[in-house]
Amino acid sequence: ADIDVSRNWFVSIDIRKLYLKTDASGYLGPQEAKAKVTLDPLITSIAIGRQF
């Protein structure tokens, strides 16, 4: 969301939640390794901008 602070300046705020699931596999030497990976990061950003 962009919020006007004055005629030329604004603040932008963004919040996102992601849900990711994946399977990983590989070898650790001769031994096979497998993993199930679940990520759910909350990503936030705040920006200050100037319009001209």
Curated annotation (Swiss-Prot):
Domain of life: Bacteria
GO cellular component labels: outer membrane
UniProt pathway: Aromatic compound metabolism; naphthalene degradation
The UniProt record lists the keyword Mitochondrion: no
Keywords: Aromatic hydrocarbons catabolism, Plasmid
Keyword Chaperone annotated: no
Pfam families in alphabetical order: OmpW
Single GO BP term: catabolic process
Biological role stated in the UniProt entry: May be involved in the conversion of 2-hydroxy-4-(2'-oxo-3,5-cyclohexadienyl)-buta-2,4-dienoate to cis-O-hydroxybenzylidenepyruvate. DoxH and DoxJ encode different enzymes that may have interchangeable functions.
Protein name: Dibenzothiophene metabolism operon protein NahQ/DoxH
Gene this protein is translated from: nahQ
